[in-house]
Amino acid sequence: MENLNPNTILRVAVDLAKRVYQIHAVNQFEAVALTKAMTPGKFFDWCRSLPAGCMVAMESCSGAHYVGRRLAAMGLSPRIIAAHHVKPYRVAGAKAKNDANDAAAICEAASRPHLHSVPIKTA
């Protein structure tokens, strides 16, 4: 996974937390290209290597608008999705609620073309 070519990434989903962001990326064949936890600083550094216009999806939360503005400034396409739209794509089960599964559910929800997203608010 470290030899990953960022130009092959079609869509990235990130589960935002205070200290660690969980990343889930898929390629043009909808296959998982990367699943990794990163600090916010390393995440933004990594995002600079993504192709312009790459979709980066996240679940709506207090920090999502800040992250969305930073990603838009890098030339990426941020998409904030309301939590109730992500919930149907989560894996069922008692131990399924974790950051990695949440990021995968966000990625799956973002693949739906007619799913309403939250507009990014200005500072």
Give the location of each predicted region.
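Phosphate- and other anionic-substrate recognition elements at nucleic-acid/protein interfaces
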Residues: 1-123
